[in-house]
Structures are given as C-alpha cells and as structure tokens.
Swiss-Prot record:
Its EC number is 3.1.3.84. The keyword Hydrolase applies. SMART domains: A1pp. Residues 1-179 form the Macro domain. The lineage of its organism: Eukaryota, Fungi, Dikarya, Ascomycota, Saccharomycotina. SUPFAM superfamilies: Macro domain-like. Highly specific phosphatase involved in the metabolism of ADP-ribose 1''-phosphate (Appr1p) which is produced as a consequence of tRNA splicing. PANTHER family: ADP-RIBOSE GLYCOHYDROLASE OARD1, PROTEIN C6ORF130. InterPro entries: ADP-ribose_metab_enzymes (IPR050892), Macro_dom (IPR002589), Macro_dom-like (IPR043472). GO terms for molecular function: ADP-ribosyl-[dinitrogen reductase] hydrolase activity; phosphoprotein phosphatase activity. It comes from Debaryomyces hansenii (strain ATCC 36239 / CBS 767 / BCRC 21394 / JCM 1990 / NBRC 0083 / IGC 2968) (Yeast). This is ADP-ribose 1''-phosphate phosphatase.
Length: 179
C-alpha cells in the first residue's frame, strides 16, 4: 500500500520509539550520491554513503551486476539524520540504474530493476524482522519511507514507478512529497 505524505522524508519518526525506520532511495551502481535526493542522504547519513561507495567499488569490474538488488545499510548513531532521538535509520539503496545523467537506463529498464530491488528489499526486511523491531503498521506491514524514487534525476514518470510499488501489498510505503 502506498500512502502519500506531504513533508520532509528526513523528519519521519516511527510510531514506536524502539522501532527502526527504513528510508529507501533509488541509486546508481557507480557509488555516487552527488545529485538530487541522494545528496541529502549523503549529508544526513555519511556512514551509509561510505558503505554504499565501498560496496560499489568492490563491484567496479561489472557494476551492472548490482542492478535489481538492494543494499540495506544501518546508519551510524552519530549521523546527523539520527538527530530526532529515534532508533538508527536503515538506508535501503535500491539499485535501479547502472549509470546516472545521460547514460542512465530507459524508464522501462529502471522500472524492471525497481521491481527486482523491491523484492530483494522485502526479503531482507523479512530476515531483519527476526532480529530487530522494524516500524510496522497495526496490520503487520513493514513501513518503508521514500521520496518519489526514480522521478528525479532518473526521469522516470512517477506513474510507472507507482505501478511497480503497488505490487508490494505486504509493505506499507510512505512516499514523501514536497511542494
């Protein structure tokens, strides 16, 4: 289920103070958070960026192997994005496009990789639930918070990504929108 929330993704706090929040965003496979919402993730969660960049560099021989996967990273308690007194945020890097800029993939390819990345995230969250308390709805759906992924620098019409996200009925997806 998708719920639209007007406001800043980075002010989100879980309903239970002991629960972990999941913040997801679409990423390239080249280790760059240099534009769009990724730059805000970089400022808020520098420890997660380092892990992401290092992970991408270990796949530098063929970064496209990361497409359709998700890297789920626990941020550091010292990251500025954890200032709201909440539990540590987990950053989900959805590898939806190999490159960025003019070399980004087509909207159809990005949508297909989003579907695969979300399936991978869903699997990882099921495992993580066995070890940690993750923010969930009263119906038991894990809450995933995100901006309108792919709609910025990857230039995918939102309706295409929205159709993909609507397939994940077992997840409660908060999509943050800013005017």
């Amino acid at each position: 289920m998708i719920k639209y929330i007007k406001g800043d993704l980075f002010t989100h706090t879980p309903s239970s103070r002991s629960a972990i929040s999941i913040f997801a965003h679409a990423c390239n496979c080249r280790g760059s958070w240099g534009g769009g919402i990724a730059t805000v993730f970089y400022r808020k969660f520098p420890s997660a960026y380092k892990i992401y960049a290092d992970y991408c560099s270990t796949h530098a021989d063929d970064p496209s192997k990361l497409l359709g996967t998700t890297l789920l990273i626990p941020s550091s308690s010292s990251d500025p994005g954890n200032e709201n007194g909440q539990k540590i945020v987990y950053v989900a890097c959805l590898f939806t496009s190999d490159f960025y800029g003019k070399k980004k993939l087509t909207p159809g390819d990005i949508a297909a990789n989003t579907d695969l990345s979300m399936k991978d995230l869903d699997t990882q969250l099921e495992s993580l639930k066995e070890e940690k308390e993750i923010e969930s709805t009263d119906q038991g759906e894990v809450v995933v918070n995100m901006p309108k992924i792919n709609a910025g620098l990857f230039a995918v019409p939102w309706e295409i990504t929205e159709d993909v996200l609507n397939k994940f009925n077992n997840l409660h997806i908060n999509v943050y929108v800013v005017d």
